[in-house]
Amino acid sequence: MPPTKAEKKPAEKKPAEKAPAEKKPKAEKKISKEGSSDKKKKRTKKSVETYKIYIFKVLKQVHPDIGVSSKAMGIMNSFINDIFEKLAQESSRLARYNKKPTITSREIQTAVRLVLPGELAKHAVSEGTKAVTKFTSS
């Protein structure tokens, strides 16, 4: 039994010695990658567009004393993305039906009327019209 213990101890030391030896080439690879990592950082930087700041601004206009959790903000962001996706699909479908290559404000307005229900559609159309006139006048 004592010889097996002696054999186990060197066996344990050998993998321990190999592990740092393996780490050294990895470190060298990392050093070689660091020179090109500036390029990779530029490639991997994706601008994630969210509506979180705009949702927060609207919340503060409506209820200045109320906050919102990050989970609720994520849900609201997903909701806005979903609504915009539905509006884009519907306006694209309308443009195809009318054999037009361009989606104009008219297609967007009709899509809003089709996608959003009742009173919400009326308010959205009036706010959208107001935003378009403000944009074209400036």
From Swiss-Prot:
Can be acetylated to form H2BK6ac, H2BK33ac and H2BK34ac. Monoubiquitinated to form H2BK143ub1; may give a specific tag for epigenetic transcriptional activation. It comes from the Eukaryota. Gene3D superfamilies: Histone, subunit A (1.10.20.10). CDD domains: HFD_H2B. The modification N6-acetyllysine is found at K8, K29, K30. The keyword Nucleus applies. Pfam families: Histone. It is found in: Nucleus; Chromosome. InterPro entries: Histone-fold, Histone_H2A/H2B/H3, Histone_H2B, HISTONE_H2B_site. There is a cross-link at K134 (Glycyl lysine isopeptide (Lys-Gly) (interchain with G-Cter in ubiquitin)). Keywords: Acetylation, Chromosome, DNA-binding, Isopeptide bond, Nucleosome core, Nucleus, Ubl conjugation. Belongs to the histone H2B family. This is Probable histone H2B.3. It comes from Medicago truncatula. The lineage of its organism: Eukaryota, Viridiplantae, Streptophyta, Embryophyta, Tracheophyta.
